[in-house]
Amino acid sequence: MMLEGYTVQPPQSTLIGDIEIQDENANQEVKNVLYQGVQKGIKRLEKRQRRVALGDVTSQKANKIHNAIHNKFHQTKNNFEIENIRSSALVKEQQRDVRHEDSDYFLIDSSEGSSTDDEQVNEDAIDDLLSRRVNDQQIQADEVYEDFDGEMQDVIEEDVDSQIEPLSPINNDEIQTELDRAFEKYFRSVPNPLDDDTHDVVMVVEYASDIFYYLRELEVKYRPNPYYMQNQVELTWPFRRTMIDWLVQLHFRFQLLPETLYLTINIVDRFLSKKTVTLNRFQLVGVSALFIAAKFEEINCPTLDDLVYMLENTYTRDDIIRAEQYMIDTLEFEIGWPGPMPFLRRISKADDYDFEPRTLAKYLLETTIVEPKLVAAAPSWLAAGAYFLSRTILGSNDWSLKHVFYSGYTSSQIIPLASLILENCKNASRRHHSIWKKYFDQKHYRCSQIVEEWIVSTEA
């Protein structure tokens, strides 16, 4: 069943990119070329210094020493593989020849079709790509992930036409009754003097209920169309997963906030809900969304030079700036999507802000960004599902009225979501490799390992 308010309608007929691939075999070749930038991209990525998040401006010398030590430590071969989603330099060069000069220069109206000259450019570019492909058949295997090439082949061969039905919480009279009971028991019009939050000015307890009521409105207002992929000509859900895998690694290298990553994915999905994007411009959309989100959420955000370097000069500073302008204009400057992190912190209040379930929930929550069924899911619901599952893994199987009050969801609404998250955590190193690898680190308390071991123990 489709979500209320959404129907499958063609978006505005605009294609990002100046060359449309007409020949099916040629299009397959371009998709194959898509994965050949892996080795170069990650080597350049690994050489970059890590950004010190929220660094003290008075300790720049200490930061330089830290970065020097860090870079020396990371001279070994990288443990992360990156999907550098890009077309060949030849195709990009041909695109620049036919760019528009206005603010939409990197866009082409799909209703206009391709001119004879453009078709000739396509044929020449593809012929060159095919000849270069014959001379470059060997791709080095990933040390950490030996089946990486096999996974990429699975992505190409996957049935991209299969229908993805979005998942959403159920609502009925019984659920509403339980929500009302929780509200009556725990809602206070006057702050509780025995609550520590009451005496913390940062928590603004007088306005907490109003704030989260407003955030619940925003999460509905800024949700993407869950069926937008049906209107994309060249993109598929597997390509979106590959893009997110790359963005997760870029986000990790820059040491950005979790809110920045979630907002980046929301911007990408909302933009794709309104515009049709070609494959050779998909990476530009992703990096521009990250740039926008970082400006919105961070104190220290990546510079244009940082992003151009990470893209291995596939795109220029001007490309990113113009793409940023166009995307913001398309979204009508509405980028204040709340994301799941405020809701996760709110729910943890039911357990007196217990560190363990909230930390484990961060890993489970991040895995949801690659799931097509959860593209339009409310972030408050995703946070509740991740927290519910984390408590279950840690041995707490109850979901009290207090949890219902602070989350806004009953256990019957959350269980289907928690089941989907758990299913996606099986064979996690293949389904969301970068997220799994990131949370396997001691810095993140090896959360992905904890989940893996729990799954094995329950299935034994």
From Swiss-Prot:
An example molecular function term from Gene Ontology annotations: cyclin-dependent protein serine/threonine kinase regulator activity
GO terms classed as biological process: cell division; G1/S transition of mitotic cell cycle; G2/M transition of mitotic cell cycle; positive regulation of mitotic spindle pole body separation; regulation of mitotic spindle assembly
Disulphide bridges: none
Keyword Cell division: yes
Any GO CC annotation of this UniProt entry: cyclin-dependent protein kinase holoenzyme complex
Pfam family, one: Cyclin_N
Keywords per UniProt: Cell cycle, Cell division, Cyclin, Mitosis
Family per similarity comment: Belongs to the cyclin family. Cyclin AB subfamily.
Function: Essential for the control of the cell cycle at the G2/M (mitosis) transition. Interacts with the CDC2 protein kinase to form MPF. G2/M cyclins accumulate steadily during G2 and are abruptly destroyed at mitosis.
Leftover remarks: Present with 98 molecules/cell in log phase SD medium.
UniProt-listed PANTHER family: CYCLINS
Protein name as annotated: G2/mitotic-specific cyclin-4
The gene coding this protein: CLB4
